[in-house]
C-alpha cells in the first residue's frame, strides 16, 4: 500500500487490557472524579520489559539494524505517554519516537518535572500527532473540563519543551488534524507519514 516507505521490522506488543493504564503510566494518577480510583506507576517496569527482554530477543532472532538510529517506538493515547517516557529514559537506544494522541495531561506536572532533569539528544526524531476532537468516555471519568483542549495543549507543551531543550527543529514534526477523533482510524491514517519521517535519516 505504501511502497515508498522503507522496509522495516514491526514488533507489536499486546497491552494488558484494563491494566494498560498501569503499565503505560510511569506515575500514579489519583485525581479521578471517581472516589477511590487510582492507577499507574508501573511504566518503569514495562519499559524495562521492552528494552531488557523484548528488544534483545528480537535483535537475536531477526536480522535487525539494532543501533539507535534504526530503533523506533510508537504509541497512541496511553501508549503515547509511555513512548514519551521511554524516549527520555532510553534516549541512548531509541532514535525515533512516534507520539500519537498522547494522554500526558494525566500526569503533566510529573512528566514536565522529569523532563526538566533530562539532557535531550538533538538528533532524536520525534513525530507528534493529535486531533482536535480527541476524548473518549474513559477520559470523562478522569478529568472535569475541556478534554479535547487538554490533548492539544499537552502535545504542544511536549513540542515546545523538545525545542527548548535543544532538539533540532528538523528532527521534530507535529501534526494537528482538524476534526480527527481519538481512535485507531485516525492513527492508522497518519502512521505512514510518521514512518516516512523516521526513514528520512536512515542510511
Description of each model-found segment:
Residues 1-203:
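Non-catalytic cap/lid and distal C-terminal segments of serine-dependent acyl enzymes
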Amino acid at each position: 500500500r505504501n511502497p515508498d516507505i522503507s522496509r522495516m521490522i514491526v514488533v507489536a506488543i499486546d497491552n494488558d487490557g484494563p491494566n494498560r493504564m498501569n503499565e503505560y503510566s510511569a506515575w500514579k494518577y489519583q485525581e479521578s472524579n471517581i472516589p477511590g480510583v487510582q492507577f499507574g506507576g508501573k511504566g518503569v517496569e514495562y519499559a524495562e520489559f521492552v528494552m531488557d527482554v523484548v528488544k534483545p530477543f528480537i535483535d537475536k532472532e531477526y536480522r535487525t539494524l539494532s543501533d539507535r538510529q534504526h530503533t523506533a517506538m510508537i504509541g497512541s493515547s496511553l501508549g503515547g505517554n509511555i513512548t514519551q517516557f521511554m524516549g527520555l529514559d532510553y534516549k541512548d537506544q531509541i532514535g525515533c519516537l512516534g507520539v500519537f494522541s498522547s494522554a500526558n495531561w494525566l500526569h503533566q506536572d510529573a512528566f514536565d518535572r522529569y523532563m526538566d532533569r533530562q539532557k535531550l539528544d538533538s538528533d532524536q526524531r520525534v513525530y507528534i500527532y493529535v486531533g482536535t476532537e480527541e476524548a473518549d468516555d474513559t477520559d470523562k471519568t478522569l478529568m472535569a473540563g475541556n478534554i479535547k483542549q487538554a490533548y492539544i495543549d499537552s502535545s504542544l507543551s511536549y513540542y515546545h519543551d523538545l525545542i527548548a531543550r535543544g532538539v533540532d527543529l528538523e528532527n521534530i514534526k507535529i501534526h494537528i488534524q482538524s476534526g480527527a477523533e481519538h481512535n485507531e482510524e485516525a492513527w492508522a491514517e497518519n502512521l505512514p507519514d510518521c514512518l516516512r519521517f523516521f526513514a528520512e535519516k536512515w542510511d
